[in-house]
């Protein structure tokens, strides 16, 4: 890309930094079927290429903050560790951020991430567990690993997914309170994507007539919470300055 045509120094002081791709694959969406994020179509970028791009951004434009574009940087964990070790060994002094997906992670990886310059981790609800309790436990385990190495993290929690009730809403709010992320995004409604279980639910309940309707952004909110969930989250956001309602 012709980065020389852009005002690159501005990236050092805003946002998450300049994006660098570390892996190409089918995108991971928390509302999509989890088995589609299996890794069979992954194309992991060679570590040498990633390191070279980081180095060029630094030497040519003075960029010291980058964002590793990856829906699940920690998957596979071996590749994530290899990249972190390479950053450390080459002496690149950068700050970087990325997404982690609940599941495949350990203390060695979060320690390497911190040592290699990671300053913020973003993660959302996983879908390998069907129950709210199971998914929140996965997120909590990942949060504990980050907290042990003083690695700040953010949370994105969806409210209104199929089966959502007043009880599960309270579960999620209590979880956010207890986990205390650097900041949190609470989302009203789950995005409906084609060829997913969510799309079938939307069809069954008459939210859409066919999947062609999904050419326009469509969100599902469970009937039990539809009438009040937005107001409830708005009130919670007022009490928690670091919670953002989306």
Across the structure, where does each feature detected by a protein language model lie?
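Short catalytic/ligand-binding loop motif for oxyanion handling, primarily in non-cytosolic enzymes
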Residues: 29, 75-77, 165, 192-196
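C-terminal accessory regions of radical SAM enzymes
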Residues: 7, 17-19, 152, 167-246
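Radical SAM [4Fe-4S] cluster-binding motif and immediate context
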Residues: 1-154, 159, 174
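Short, solvent-exposed loop/turn segments at secondary-structure junctions
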Residues: 161-163
């Amino acid at each position: 890309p012709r980065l020389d045509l852009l005002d690159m120094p501005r990236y050092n002081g805003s946002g998450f930094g300049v994006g660098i791709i570390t892996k190409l694959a089918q995108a991971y969406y928390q509302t999509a079927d989890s088995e589609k994020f299996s890794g069979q179509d992954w194309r992991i970028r060679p570590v040498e290429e990633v390191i070279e791009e980081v180095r060029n951004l630094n030497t040519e434009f003075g960029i010291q903050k980058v964002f590793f574009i990856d829906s699940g940087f920690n998957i596979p964990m071996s590749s994530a560790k290899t990249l972190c070790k390479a950053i450390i060994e080459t002496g690149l002094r950068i700050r970087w951020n990325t997404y982690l997906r609940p599941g495949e992670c350990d203390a060695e990886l979060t320690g390497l991430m911190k040592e290699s310059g990671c300053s913020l981790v973003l993660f959302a609800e996983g879908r390998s567990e069907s129950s709210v309790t199971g998914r929140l436990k996965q997120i909590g385990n990942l949060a504990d690993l980050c907290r042990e190495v003083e690695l700040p993290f953010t949370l994105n929690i969806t409210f209104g997914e199929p089966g959502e009730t007043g009880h599960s809403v309270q579960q999620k709010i209590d979880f956010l309170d207890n986990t205390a992320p650097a900041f949190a995004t609470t989302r009203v409604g789950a995005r409906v994507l084609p060829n997913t279980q969510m799309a079938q639910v939307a069809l069954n309940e008459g939210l859409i007539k066919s999947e062609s309707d999904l050419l326009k952004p469509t969100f599902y909110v469970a009937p039990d919470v539809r009438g009040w969930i937005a107001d409830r989250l708005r009130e919670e956001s007022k009490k928690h300055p670091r919670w953002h309602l989306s």
